[in-house]
A protein has these predicted regions:
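Short hydrophobic beta-strand that contains or immediately precedes a catalytic carboxylate
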Residues: 120, 286-289, 317, 474
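Conserved hydrophobic/aromatic pocket- or pore-lining residues that grip, position, or stack substrates
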Residues: 56, 122, 288, 319, ...
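Di-metal (Zn2+ and/or Mg2+/Mn2+) metal-binding site signature of metallo-dependent hydrolases
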Residues: 285-300
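Accessory alpha-helical DNA-binding modules that contact the DNA backbone or grooves
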Residues: 1-124, 128-132, 137-166, 187-188, ...
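Core AdoMet radical
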Residues: 359-360
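Charged catalytic cores and adjacent phosphate/nucleic-acid-binding surfaces used
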Residues: 127-201, 205-209, 214-283, 300-311, ...
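Gly-rich Lys/Arg/Thr-decorated short loops/hinges at beta-loop-alpha junctions or inter-strand turns
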Residues: 86-88, 281-287
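Generic amphipathic alpha-helical segments used as scaffolds and interaction surfaces in large
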Residues: 35, 44-47, 92-96, 190-198, ...
Length: 517
């Protein structure tokens, strides 16, 4: 109690500040390196004075870490291998943190006088799992007026730079770049600043083949002399106001932002074979959720009510089975799971949506499914199996995941790679081989929509779907507010070219039961 009072009154806790001075290390950065926890970080500081990632890298390269007791050559190499991940993770924000900020800024700018249109751009618009900074594009003929209004906004923490065409700001701790363009050039600027760079290069080459050029200012008919002209607007502008117009001027249909990664989308657009992508409104239920019976924060009844309010037709309750990697004392024993089935049945009797029984079983290192009684698993409507332990050994674990989907009791493979964005890299596996096994055995592969996971990710979804696999998009919700994570999963699946037909829980209740049977 005293420390809370001290914090409220002074904004700090003296004992904690003293600890920090005694151990002046960048704990957040060091513990992002696989194999380093707070205790290890302290040990390295005491032995070698390592305070940050630069110190760590220098010590590892000088082969000093292997001299510290408890560390060997292999650990030292592991640290070097994992440093790039730790560095990048420190510079990138999660999609789930950045997207709401971007949408708030877009909404604010969209309502400003003289703004004709405002849109998100960059990796945020492509729904990448992590984001460098937030890019927003504004169409206006009065850029100075818009800049003044923007820099006066009370959500702006600081103005890094501001000019008539570009402002860089800090909002909610994130860097935001706002670019202002002439409405006649808004579409071409949006294509350009949405990216990816690789996608834009393919478009540029396509323009050259048509005696045209494309850049952020438009699509232009050009002579050879005009193409070489340093004036970027040289030539006869044939498109630029809308993205659709830009693609049309290159003889292409519109390509959704999630696909713009140079993974064959321009060739598919040219051939007329772009997929009819899944939409948020196609989703009908959630197959992976938790309650207070395990580590969730809402009761069975609250989760059912929340799912109904969200618009779902069905909900699967899949609390954790006890096992390695599951928070101590939160996983269900067989007896507790049997008791829960009765509680779910009672709650389902009064529910306006269909409620299915399940458990989130644990995928052991050999791919077998935890310790839950198999007769009990067979009684459930559906079994989700997920890896929770032994996620960091760095070797290829395709065999582990394939063994799990080969188990006849498994219906959904949850967060297959076990990754935690910016915290823990994905387990190594071959998504195509896993997709083929899942298709053969009638198991759905999960896109876990929690912004800390987004697992599977776009390229893995595409590889699995190419092998005939079915995808399940689940929120792993631990309370009803997390049902809104679903959109992150939907757009992640869209990055993998997923259609409604590819997604298990875009089917109605009858379609779900048909798959499970």
């Amino acid at each position: 109690g005293e420390k809370i009072v001290e914090y409220v009154e002074t904004g700090q806790i003296e004992a904690l500040e003293a600890e920090r001075e005694a151990l002046p290390v960048d704990m957040a950065a060091l513990t992002r390196v696989e194999g380093i926890g707070p205790k290890t970080a302290k040990k390295l500081y005491d032995a070698l004075g390592i305070e940050d990632l630069d110190d760590l890298e220098a010590a590892a390269e000088a082969e000093e870490i292997q001299s510290v007791s408890g560390f060997g050559e292999k650990t030292e190499q592991n640290i070097l291998d994992n440093l790039p991940f730790a560095r990048e993770a420190g510079q990138r924000s999660l999609l789930g943190a950045a997207r709401p900020i971007g949408e708030e800024i877009r909404g604010f700018l969209g309502a400003v006088d003289h703004v004709e249109e405002a849109a998100l751009a960059g990796s945020l618009r492509r729904w990448r799992p992590t984001i460098g900074d937030v890019d927003v594009l504004v169409a206006t003929e009065r850029p100075r007026s818009v800049t003044e209004t923007l820099t006066d906004w009370d959500r702006v923490e600081s103005v890094v730079e501001s000019g008539p065409t570009k402002s860089t700001l800090r909002v909610a701790g994130m860097q935001v770049d706002v670019r202002q363009v002439d409405p006649a050039e808004f579409g071409s600027a949006l294509v350009y600043f949405t990216g990816s760079k690789a996608h834009n290069i393919v478009l540029r080459n396509r323009a050259i083949d048509r005696s045209r050029k494309v850049n952020e200012y438009g699509v232009f008919e050009v002579t050879d002399a005009e193409r070489a002209d340093p004036d970027t607007r040289a030539g006869d502008r044939v498109a630029g106001e809308t993205e659709e117009g830009v693609y049309e001027a290159l003889d292409l249909p519109y390509i959704p932002p999630e696909l713009r990664e140079d993974r064959g989308e321009v060739a598919a657009a040219d051939a007329g074979t772009l997929p009819d992508l899944l939409e948020e409104g196609d989703m009908r239920g959630d197959l992976h959720t938790h309650t207070t019976w395990s580590d969730g924060e809402a009761t069975i009844e609250e989760m059912i009510e929340g799912a109904a309010a969200f618009g779902h037709d069905y909900l699967v309750i899949s609390d954790h089975a006890a096992g390695p990697g599951v928070v101590a004392d939160t996983g269900l024993t067989d007896d507790q799971l049997r008791d829960q089935l009765g509680a779910i049945e009672d709650a389902a009797a009064d529910a306006e949506i269909e409620v299915l029984t399940s458990v989130e079983a644990n995928v052991a290192p050999d791919g077998s499914i935890g310790d839950t009684d198999r007769d009990l698993l067979a009684e459930l409507d559906l079994v989700v199996a997920s890896p929770h332990a032994d996620l960091r050994d760095g070797s290829d674990r395709t065999d582990r995941l394939v063994a799990a989907v080969e188990d006849p009791l498994v219906d959904v493979l949850g967060h297959p790679s076990g990754r935690l964005l910016n915290e823990r890299p994905a387990m190594e596996f071959d998504p195509g081989a896993l997709g083929a096994a899942a298709a053969k055995h009638g198991v759905a592969l999960e896109v876990n929509a929690n912004p800390h996971r987004l697992d599977l990710w776009g390229a893995a979804v595409a590889a699995a779907i190419d092998e005939g696999a079915t995808i399940a998009i689940d929120t792993d919700a631990h309370d009803p507010s997390k049902f809104s994570y679903l959109r992150y999963g939907v757009h992640t699946a869209r990055r993998g070219w997923a259609t409604k037909a590819d997604v298990l829980n875009a089917r109605d209740v009858d379609g779900l039961w048909a798959f499970l049977e």
